[in-house]
Amino acid sequence: MAIILPELPYAYDALEPQFDAETMTLHHDKHHATYVANTNAALEKHPEIGENLEELLADVTKIPEDIRQALINNGGGHLNHALFWELLSPEKQDVTSDVAQAIDDAFGSFDAFKEQFTAAATGRFGSGWAWLVVNKEGQLEITSTANQDTPISEGKKPILALDVWEHAYYLNYRNVRPNYIKAFFEIINWKKVSELYQAAK
């Protein structure tokens, strides 16, 4: 067996105008595909550790040292992107009632949440991700990670993710990351967020 590049759950142009087809094609077929290939190359060196990336990245000390960083970078890149694709929707969706209530409880209002999430995504220096996670206490928390690091390695369960690497937005938004973040909020798959939230509680 090997890690497989998942197909997008929609057409490459389905998220336009927010996310353009050229960016989606490059992002999925080139960037994500490279993470998958590099992950498989690392795992082939140590078949004894298996292929459950979530378990491996939950405790990176269990990953053999010679492939540890490769799996953090590439295995994390695969998991992050596989989740990211599922969190985007061609059809506009309203926030589900359970997630809306949890957001109100954690942040005071949806607007406050959106402001804090945007700040986390904008403030991430260089490449990385912004996240809404369920933490170890079962509470919602906004965080960001560098590179392809995943909150799973911190014992947190991601329920919303935004890729802020420049390859995710530069063709369409150039260096104006806030406009990309604003567009992201227009195409979130809130049903998937709810599904992840219910599973993480």
Curated annotation (Swiss-Prot):
Q: Which GO terms describe its molecular function?
A: metal ion binding; superoxide dismutase activity
Q: Give the catalysed reaction(s), semicolon-separated.
A: 2 superoxide + 2 H(+) = H2O2 + O2
Q: How does it assemble?
A: Homodimer.
Family named by the database record: Belongs to the iron/manganese superoxide dismutase family.
Q: Where does Mn(2+) bind?
A: 27, 81, 163, 167
What EC designation does it have? 1.15.1.1
- InterPro entries, alphabetized: Mn/Fe_SOD (IPR001189), Mn/Fe_SOD_BS (IPR019833), Mn/Fe_SOD_C (IPR019832), Mn/Fe_SOD_N (IPR019831), Mn/Fe_SOD_N_sf (IPR036324), SOD_C_sf (IPR036314)
- What name is this protein filed under? Superoxide dismutase [Mn]
Per its database record, what is this protein's job?
Destroys superoxide anion radicals which are normally produced within the cells and which are toxic to biological systems.
Keyword Metal-binding belongs to the record: yes
Which GO CC terms are listed, alphabetically? cytoplasm; extracellular region
Query: Which gene is transcribed and translated to give this protein?
Result: sodA
Q: Which residues form a coiled coil?
A: none
Q: Where in the cell is it found?
A: Secreted
UniProt cofactor note: Binds 1 Mn(2+) ion per subunit.
Give a yes or no for keyword Transcription regulation in this entry. Answer: no
Keywords of the record, alphabetical order, are: Manganese, Metal-binding, Oxidoreductase, Secreted
Please give one Pfam family short name: Sod_Fe_N
Cofactor(s) listed in the protein's UniProt record = Mn(2+)
